[in-house]
């Protein structure tokens, strides 16, 4: 729920500010300022601010994280890899949420979910390290029952289901299969008592079906909002995404969704 709203919304929006920083860094300037973008997003209805501190610092940098943390009125959702350096930074900054993600230096963006089952002990240790300093842990995983169960066993109270394959599907049949995987993943997570979020690759014309899924608490969206802001303005881009999500969820609750 946004700090600026007086009643809970049907579904929360976490606005990812990474690509505001990308635009800044590509020319080595001090603008556009991701801190300003984050605070404006809160005022426009964002329920959380998401940012990914990558090991290569290709967009968000350490100073962004440290400067933003005390300024937020909603929540900071800090995405980071399961490495000693990143976990130590997260424990120092103490965001409200830390979402552990896989990371490859050569990738353009995160390409898949964290393999919790395959790196179970490392992930479990990371969950404990963060929880011990009061940080709520989320694991960014594929909508796969094995990974969801491993996330629960590792001690994570939150999962974020990777929607990239749904978003990048080549045809309707493939997209429907991925949608059904996400629905099953949401149900599996809910049965284990996990808070279920979702994100990756969602934009203004594909988010509706995902936002309509009962049980998804929050969607994290960034690139599409930054891109739309070029034409609509930042505040409008955030408000429009939030409105689309809420409308889809309300319609689903009243029997209007597929």
Swiss-Prot record:
<feature type="binding site">
    <location>
        <position position="16"/>
    </location>
    <ligand>
        <name>3-amino-2-oxopropyl phosphate</name>
    </ligand>
</feature>
<keyword id="KW-0808">Transferase</keyword>
<keyword id="KW-0664">Pyridoxine biosynthesis</keyword>
<dbReference type="GO" id="GO:0005829">
    <property type="term" value="C:cytosol"/>
</dbReference>
<feature type="active site" description="Proton acceptor">
    <location>
        <position position="52"/>
    </location>
</feature>
<dbReference type="InterPro" id="IPR036130">
    <property type="entry name" value="Pyridoxine-5'_phos_synth"/>
</dbReference>
<dbReference type="GO" id="GO:0033856">
    <property type="term" value="F:pyridoxine 5'-phosphate synthase activity"/>
</dbReference>
<comment type="similarity">
    <text>Belongs to the PNP synthase family.</text>
</comment>
<protein>
    <recommendedName>
        <fullName>Pyridoxine 5'-phosphate synthase</fullName>
        <ecNumber>2.6.99.2</ecNumber>
    </recommendedName>
</protein>
<comment type="pathway">
    <text>Cofactor biosynthesis; pyridoxine 5'-phosphate biosynthesis; pyridoxine 5'-phosphate from D-erythrose 4-phosphate: step 5/5.</text>
</comment>
<feature type="site" description="Transition state stabilizer">
    <location>
        <position position="160"/>
    </location>
</feature>
<dbReference type="InterPro" id="IPR013785">
    <property type="entry name" value="Aldolase_TIM"/>
</dbReference>
<feature type="active site" description="Proton acceptor">
    <location>
        <position position="79"/>
    </location>
</feature>
<feature type="active site" description="Proton donor">
    <location>
        <position position="200"/>
    </location>
</feature>
<feature type="binding site">
    <location>
        <begin position="18"/>
        <end position="19"/>
    </location>
    <ligand>
        <name>1-deoxy-D-xylulose 5-phosphate</name>
    </ligand>
</feature>
<dbReference type="InterPro" id="IPR004569">
    <property type="entry name" value="PyrdxlP_synth_PdxJ"/>
</dbReference>
<dbReference type="GO" id="GO:0008615">
    <property type="term" value="P:pyridoxine biosynthetic process"/>
</dbReference>
<feature type="binding site">
    <location>
        <position position="59"/>
    </location>
    <ligand>
        <name>1-deoxy-D-xylulose 5-phosphate</name>
    </ligand>
</feature>
<feature type="binding site">
    <location>
        <begin position="222"/>
        <end position="223"/>
    </location>
    <ligand>
        <name>3-amino-2-oxopropyl phosphate</name>
    </ligand>
</feature>
<feature type="binding site">
    <location>
        <position position="27"/>
    </location>
    <ligand>
        <name>3-amino-2-oxopropyl phosphate</name>
    </ligand>
</feature>
<feature type="binding site">
    <location>
        <position position="109"/>
    </location>
    <ligand>
        <name>1-deoxy-D-xylulose 5-phosphate</name>
    </ligand>
</feature>
<dbReference type="Pfam" id="PF03740">
    <property type="entry name" value="PdxJ"/>
</dbReference>
<comment type="function">
    <text>Catalyzes the complicated ring closure reaction between the two acyclic compounds 1-deoxy-D-xylulose-5-phosphate (DXP) and 3-amino-2-oxopropyl phosphate (1-amino-acetone-3-phosphate or AAP) to form pyridoxine 5'-phosphate (PNP) and inorganic phosphate.</text>
</comment>
<keyword id="KW-0963">Cytoplasm</keyword>
<feature type="binding site">
    <location>
        <position position="54"/>
    </location>
    <ligand>
        <name>1-deoxy-D-xylulose 5-phosphate</name>
    </ligand>
</feature>
<comment type="subunit">
    <text>Homooctamer; tetramer of dimers.</text>
</comment>
<feature type="binding site">
    <location>
        <position position="201"/>
    </location>
    <ligand>
        <name>3-amino-2-oxopropyl phosphate</name>
    </ligand>
</feature>
